[in-house]
Amino acid sequence: MTLVKLFFFALSTLGTFELLRLAGRNRIQTHFLPSLTIAVQVSVLFLAGLWNLLPEAAGILYLLGFFGLFLLVVREKSLNFLRKYADFGYAAFLMILMGSALAVKGKMFLQYDNFSHWALVVREMLRFDRFPNFADTLIHFQEYPLGSAAYIYYFAHWVGTTEPLQMLAQAYAIAAAILPLFSRVTGRKPLCCAALLGFAWFVFDYNTAITDLLVDTLLPMVGMCALLFAVTHCKKGCGKFELFCAACYSIWLVQIKNSGIFFLLPIVLVIVPYAHRQKAWGACASVLLAPLVSLVLWQKHCAYVFPAAASTTHAMTLSNYQATLQGKSAEEILTICRSFLTFALTYRGLWLTVVFCGMLGGLVFLLNRPMRKDFIRIALFSAGLYLVYQLGNLGMYLLSMPTVQALRLGGVERYTKTVLLAILYLNMLPMLRLISDTPVKSRALALTAGFLVTLFAFLYLNLGSLEAIFQGREDPAKRQWLESVRVEYGLPEGESYRVLLPAEAANDRGYTYVLTRYTFRSNSVQVLTEDDLGSLSADDANFLLIYGTQSPAVSAWVRTHYPDQAGRPVINLWLE
């Protein structure tokens, strides 16, 4: 049944491709259609979610795709329009999707941040068919945008709500953002197809895992895809439809994550000169203002549906920034700045990226003189992007992140890899052009092939983990145990749970807390060790879950207080 639903979803999506192509009068490059479709759909779903019309909008978008497909078949009286998708770029795209489907098959969410927000918010949206509001007390990061969650909701709403399908939806969005790289390919397409596959594999392995709904990989892919769209369609001359598309990309970008605004700046630098030359400020205002208006609307929505949204962690409000900064002493601020700057300038991944780009630049200067200026522009832009994005990250640690997390630079490597992925995306453009455009001379071709193989080997051996994306990164034991006892003992949602960890797992309290909270949809969760058993007698909890082998002290406590439940991993605390 899932395959049938996926087939019909693909038909609807294909129909939307064609509607956008017709609306743009064939001016939109074909390789942008998958990502552009998502950008338009997310923009519509975002507005619909604000009006509490999420399922209605999902239905309209789905049916609109079938209408587009029907309209095209009737007009052309054939399926010849499919030929435009029969190229090596789309072949790579399909292979990426098939590999992604195999990678997520049978997987479950395991990483911490899935349970604290990213997977949690998608599950709640699917359950209630709306954006979260005051009734969703499980949602802690209330001002986090829902750009990625909105598309996963749309995909899962029609295909299936299982966790692997949610992962596949995110993988599809990432692959759709990678595909436009092929728009610059003119020759040697089989080799470029292989290069695109290799890059996609690296992208799914480098930062966040393909089995996560975290957006630190999606964000740079969408940001650079949107920039490439602006350069391709809006730099020299474009119509209102192209500007509308750029506006949708911009809305999608800033609604993925707050830091998406830093990837919006390059798009503005492309649009503003065009608006100045063509005296088209009115038409270009949509691209410049639409994402900012969407941010304002989102903040107004959060303030309306979450009474305390303005003071939650990472809320984009002056009051929250002021309170967070005032919570740090001058010495702590200085320590954070020193630690961050040291990391930003000495991070191994940064300098390996510099070496990689330098090797690629050497190849460009040696073999393809016309590309030299373009490569220099990319290099300068990459340096500027890294500087601006890292300054934004430093501001986040000072103004938005709690002191304890900021002092240990929580998540700094993941955030840095976000901007490095954007830089590597940009450098794939000259790499693909080298493969595509280098003159057919045996020596030059052999040199190009040899260097590119070396570059990719360097990329994988030094920047990636070389860990197969099919194996996963996290230990599933704890989640599998929780799911098994939930099913075996029929444990209900929303009750009060206590989880007892063995002493050697005491450092795992935080993960166990968010996992238990996610599993049982409960706000009343505490994680205990043997030393805390005495407090249970005065606690009004419902269930005690005992993880791992019971120690003699735990077994004795259970026999004393709950003799009829001795030896069980689940103790009903309401039964004496």
Task: Describe each model-derived feature in a short phrase.
Residues 239-250, 268, 282-292, 431-464:
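Signature aromatic-anchored transmembrane alpha helix within multi-pass, membrane-resident enzymes
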Residues 452-512, 518:
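Membrane-embedded, lumen/periplasm-facing catalytic core of multi-pass transferases
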Residues 70-84, 263-289, 365:
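Perimembrane helix-loop-helix junctions
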